[in-house]
Amino acid sequence: MSGRSPKAPRAPSSTRAGGLVVAAHGRHYLVAPDDGGAMLQCFPRGKRSEVAVGDHVIYELASADQGVIVEIGERRNLLYRSDQYKSKLFAANLDQLLIVLATEPHFSEDLLGRALVAAEANGLKPLIVLNKTDVTDELEGARKRLEPYRALGYTVVEVSIRTQPEAARAALIERLHGHSTLLLGQSGMGKSTLVNLLIPDAEVATREISTALNSGRHTTTFTRLYPLPDSADGTGGSLIDSPGFQEFGLHHLTEGRLERAFPEFRPLLPNCRFYNCHHLHEPGCAILEAVADGRIRRERHALYAQLVHEASQIVR
């Protein structure tokens, strides 16, 4: 999928202007104007906040450095954080999901599986990065755990950010140019180190964004977008860093979207006896037959069943 952004709304008058939402904290948003001017702190109009990092918006100037968001451009996709009680959008207009894992500490396959489902459900290309390959005692075990995901067609890139930073950067940067990529990773996997490797002034930018959003000490609690340095052919791209891998939610997905977010399920779906099969205990279910004979891993089906259960519990 191309990294080209959806068409942004057009500002109809001189009192309005367009821009890109590059950071969010609560109802505070930082917008980079399309004309290249200084970034503005913006607020949504009304009580509801329906703005996400990566949105193209129209804002009205309220002062020299503040604005009110009055319109949101057409979105290519939208990702949420969800729990049983609420669902909050946080990133829009993505085309890749980069998941940082490591040989140590032990990474969670449940969280990896959920991230892959989110990518599939939103039309994103997943990219798995296995960091800390220099920890050789754990390397083969990590490779073995990732082999089933390679078999499903997912790309796994092995790096050692600490011991071979330039090789790691070279292995990843060309995969990121021209794309809008969301970066996810559990604590200890090396995600922050990777951001600083790919975005040389990331720490300075984070401090500036924190100040602009008045988020003070909460510097790790906001989602932010970093423009990538241009490649040799002039294509840039962006990297969106978001905290809280554990909060990455899928409860808002319908059962139909969930079943199609498992690539190994898709070819078998037409073979179920019942058109409205839930793939949990129905007779003649092609998915359950594939689980029984080993074509589909039991762990993957268990994740699907858990996600269906969680989706049924959400308060809508």
From Swiss-Prot:
GO function terms (MF aspect): GTP binding; GTPase activity; metal ion binding; rRNA binding
Cofactor remark from the record: Binds 1 zinc ion per subunit.
Gene3D superfamilies: Nucleic acid-binding proteins, P-loop containing nucleotide triphosphate hydrolases, Probable gtpase engc, domain 3
A single cellular component GO annotation: cytoplasm
The keyword Zinc is annotated on this UniProt entry: yes
Subcellular location per the Swiss-Prot or TrEMBL entry: Cytoplasm
One record GO biological process: ribosomal small subunit biogenesis
Recorded superkingdom: Bacteria
EC annotation from Swiss-Prot or TrEMBL: 3.6.1.-
Residue intervals of the CP-type G domain: 83-248
Cofactor: Zn(2+)
InterPro entries per UniProt: G_CP_dom (IPR030378), NA-bd_OB-fold (IPR012340), P-loop_NTPase (IPR027417), Ribosome_biogen_GTPase_RsgA (IPR004881), RsgA_GTPase_dom (IPR010914), RsgA_N (IPR031944)
SUPFAM superfamilies: Nucleic acid-binding proteins, P-loop containing nucleoside triphosphate hydrolases
Listed Pfam families: RsgA_GTPase
Keyword line: Cytoplasm, GTP-binding, Hydrolase, Metal-binding, Nucleotide-binding, Ribosome biogenesis, RNA-binding, rRNA-binding, Zinc
Record-listed Zn(2+) binding positions: C272, C277, H279, C285
Residues binding GTP, per UniProt: N131, K132, T133, D134, G185, Q186, S187, G188, M189, G190, K191, S192, T193
Function text: One of several proteins that assist in the late maturation steps of the functional core of the 30S ribosomal subunit. Helps release RbfA from mature subunits. May play a role in the assembly of ribosomal proteins into the subunit. Circularly permuted GTPase that catalyzes slow GTP hydrolysis, GTPase activity is stimulated by the 30S ribosomal subunit.
Assembly and oligomerization: Monomer. Associates with 30S ribosomal subunit, binds 16S rRNA.
Similarity comment: Belongs to the TRAFAC class YlqF/YawG GTPase family. RsgA subfamily.
Protein name as annotated: Small ribosomal subunit biogenesis GTPase RsgA
Organism: Paraburkholderia xenovorans (strain LB400)
